A protein has these predicted regions:
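N-terminal and secondary-structure boundary signal
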Residues: 1-210
Length: 210
């Protein structure tokens, strides 16, 4: 509606493709985002706002992936029309990896609107999974935060306030294969609304039988 706020949630996973394909084959392209943004502004008008918000993988170089995906050109395109397309990197931290080892960390500005702790409690599938939270592993070496936020009845996630406070979120995933889930679609794409992915259990320590 007029004056509303719309968030576009693309998949900007990484600034490179670890496989043999191009970067464009693993990220949501700006040409697709532009068309959706056009319709978003038709809905909210010039008094409304349209935001691209994403939390790519922790080692992703935002400036590079933004260039590959055409985000910078998209911002310029709407600026020529007198419209400000906001772009938010939801991550609180970026890391440098060498051979899979973290060798450096950079604190990022994060979500300018802040974050909200969302506790799913018993509504989380983890609550009845029978899994030992002490064996949960997230996106970093330290298992502490992952276990802490998924124990004693808690199942907490640090979610972007930009996303939660918007009037509408339009999920714009990239259709591609995934080594764990088979395919990456809209549900998997929502991993990127988490400000700290170490709150999100990615793995469980142990062998397959355990």
């Amino acid at each position: 509606s007029e004056g509303g706020r719309v968030v576009l949630k693309p998949n900007l996973i990484r600034h490179f493709n670890p496989g043999e394909g191009s970067v464009e084959s693993v990220v949501t392209h700006g040409a697709f985002l532009r068309v959706v943004a056009d319709y978003a502004w038709l809905a909210v008008g010039r008094n409304g706002s349209v935001v691209i918000a994403e939390a790519p993988q922790q080692d992703c170089k935002w400036a590079i992936v933004s260039e590959y995906a055409g985000i910078d050109r998209l911002v310029d395109h709407f600026a020529r029309m007198g419209l400000t397309l906001e772009v938010v990197d939801i991550r609180r931290e970026e890391v440098d990896l060498v051979d899979g080892i973290i060798v450096g960390r950079v604190t990022l500005p994060g979500d300018p609107a802040g974050y909200r702790v969302v506790d799913l409690g018993d509504l989380s599938f983890f609550s009845e999974s029978g899994l030992d939270a002490k064996r949960f592993r997230g996106a970093d070496y330290d298992p502490g935060p992952t276990s802490e936020h998924h124990s004693n009845g808690r199942n907490e996630y640090l979610i972007s306030e930009t996303v939660l406070s918007s009037d509408l979120v339009i999920n714009l995933p990239k259709l591609k294969t995934h080594k764990k889930t088979g395919v990456t679609l809209a549900l998997k794409n929502l991993v990127g609304i988490n400000g700290d992915k170490n709150w999100l259990p990615h793995h469980t320590l142990g062998n397959p039988e355990e």
